[in-house]
Amino acid sequence: LIGLVGSEMCIRDSDDPKENAEHVMLVDLARNDLSRNCHDVKVDFYKEMQYYSHVIHLVSRVSGTLREEADPVKAFIDTFPAGTLSGAPKVRAMQLISQLEPHNRGAYGGCIGFIGLNGSLNQAITIRTFVSRNGVLWFQAGGGIVAKSNDEYELQEVNNKLGALKKAIEMAEKM
């Protein structure tokens, strides 16, 4: 993820060794997760820039063909949690998250979606999502921290992500 919007920042961060190393790690995690149940795992596109109101994402798509003997539900489960929200190595990263974060993530980082009667699947990771609980609206954002992270930059990235949600609240209040 590239956390700030602007062409100069976009060009600088697309060449940033830390951002690139983080992205390579996440693509490798996705390839590994899919390889448990798929063959012909491939990267369909790699490091495309996608622009949003408050952030710019480096996006890659990894896909595979489900093995004939594989259970589709197990294949789905084996991809969670997404490496983009856990880090690597996945199991140890999740243990550290559990120890260090002050509360359970709740819906954040899980998924929402549906399985159609025809076997189709459509799902999304629940990030930058509002959850209403007991009359209180909850939302949260996070960022990937790696050895070469800059604390101020990572905090700015999280604030940029939250900015889109805050803007949505402001717009809803005007309706």
Where are these regions (language model features)?
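Extended alpha-helical targeting/anchoring segments
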Residues: 7-8, 12-175
